[in-house]
């Protein structure tokens, strides 16, 4: 059997493995479909993650260096690529009561022919309803971050909303904002194909940031007022600078991206200083949730799964391209790392 592994920075390969015996609380799944994570996973793949030599210390709530003799946060050769899988249970441990052999399920896991997952008190292992879409299922993870971005920005009926970066998270945020009652939804992305999909699913306008004063265009489209909410998913300094320029007085930027380091020139003066801008850093998996105790990550996940399975969210167009597992190393390097403009969220069939 084979699994997709990062053997070196920016190098993916299929590697042989043998399954271990499952424990009493586990199930083994034969994977049929899957998808990688195009955001933070790619930072890891490029060896650009702070987690390689540092760890986020929960007690101090800050990054601290790993001890010199401790394992690195990412070890190439062992680093398995992939985020979500859909497949059929082929083995159940003796303590498993909520699942059975033959069940079709979705869960977090790497791109490999089989995965072993805890199946006792694990709400993240989801049963696939009859006839449900695997493409919607593998968007379970990005949907959570899109939902938290929309909720943390307090999008309300009638708001002018901008979504910057139309990858999977941004595309789902477009759908959620429009369905939440935003009167004008504007997408920002340089890739025409992504903009076309966003328009099909709720965007009233899309802007190409290349050669465009995005902030001024947002003000023009909103009668000089600016956006009540801007959801920033790209992580680029220019995008945040444009968002500060296009934000309405007292508006909110919901910063969803795991940002890249900002080069010299980023300016928190100018419009940011004059327009009482608010920046909220949004992360679905940071607990306690800003709306705790009413909301938690579990509630976000439960809600996202329901919306994905009942068709409220439509992610069929977002899984593009779809490649075979046999071709996944080359496809990962091309579509996820080297030419991300050629994809939104890559799907993998087994």
From Swiss-Prot:
Known EC number: 1.1.1.-
Catalytic activities: a D-guloside + NAD(+) = a 3-dehydro-D-guloside + NADH + H(+)
Domain of life: Bacteria
Keywords for the protein's UniProt record, in alphabetical order: Carbohydrate metabolism, Metal-binding, NAD, Oxidoreductase, Zinc
Cofactor: Zn(2+)
Keyword DNA repair: no
GO molecular function: oxidoreductase activity, acting on the CH-OH group of donors, NAD or NADP as acceptor; zinc ion binding
A Pfam family this chain is assigned to: ADH_zinc_N
Cofactor binding: number and manner: Binds 1 Zn(2+) ions per subunit.
Family: Belongs to the zinc-containing alcohol dehydrogenase family.
Protein's job: Catalyzes the NAD(+)-dependent oxidation of the hydroxyl group at C3 of D-gulosides leading to 3-dehydro-D-gulosides. Probably functions in a metabolic pathway that transforms D-gulosides to D-glucosides. Is also able to catalyze the reverse reactions, i.e. the NADH-dependent reduction of the oxo group at C3 of 3-dehydro-D-gulosides leading to D-gulosides. In vitro, can oxidize D-gulose and methyl beta-D-guloside, and reduce methyl alpha-3-dehydro-D-guloside and methyl beta-3-dehydro-D-guloside. However, the actual specific physiological substrates for this metabolic pathway are unknown.
Designated name of the protein: D-guloside 3-dehydrogenase
Species this chain originates from: Escherichia coli (strain K12)
């Amino acid at each position: 059997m084979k699994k997709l592994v990062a053997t070196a920075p920016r190098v993916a390969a299929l590697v042989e493995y043998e399954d271990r015996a499952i424990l009493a609380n586990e199930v083994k799944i034969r994977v049929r479909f899957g998808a990688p994570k195009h955001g933070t996973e790619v930072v890891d793949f490029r060896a650009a993650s702070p987690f390689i030599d540092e760890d986020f210390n929960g007690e101090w709530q800050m990054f601290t260096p790993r001890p010199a003799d401790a394992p690195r946060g990412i070890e190439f050769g062992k680093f398995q690529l992939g985020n979500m899988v859909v497949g059929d249970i082929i083995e159940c441990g003796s303590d498993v009561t909520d699942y059975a052999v033959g069940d079709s399920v979705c869960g977090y896991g790497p791109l490999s022919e089989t995965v072993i997952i805890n199946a006792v008190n694990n709400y993240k292992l989801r049963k696939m309803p009859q006839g449900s879409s695997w493409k919607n299922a593998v968007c379970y993870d990005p949907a959570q971050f899109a939902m938290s971005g929309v909720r943390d920005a307090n999008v309300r009926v009638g708001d002018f909303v901008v979504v910057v970066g139309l990858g999977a998270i941004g595309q789902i945020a477009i759908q959620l904002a429009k369905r939440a009652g935003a009167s004008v939804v504007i997408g920002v992305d340089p890739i025409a194909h992504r903009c076309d999909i966003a328009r099909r699913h709720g965007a009233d306008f899309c802007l190409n940031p290349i050669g465009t004063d995005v902030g001024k265009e947002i003000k023009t489209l909103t009668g000089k007022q600016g956006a009540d909410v801007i959801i920033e998913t790209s992580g680029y300094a220019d995008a945040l600078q444009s968002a500060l320029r296009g934000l309405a007085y007292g508006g909110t930027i919901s910063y969803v991206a795991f940002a890249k380091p900002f080069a010299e020139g980023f300016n928190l003066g100018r419009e940011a200083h004059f327009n009482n801008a608010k920046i909220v850093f949004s992360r679905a998996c940071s607990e306690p949730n800003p709306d705790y105790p009413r909301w938690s990550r579990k509630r976000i996940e439960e809600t996202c799964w329901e919306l994905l399975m009942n068709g409220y969210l439509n992610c069929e167009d977002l899984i593009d391209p779809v490649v075979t597992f046999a071709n996944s190393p080359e496809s990962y390097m091309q579509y996820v790392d080297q030419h991300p403009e050629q994809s939104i969220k890559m799907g993998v069939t087994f």
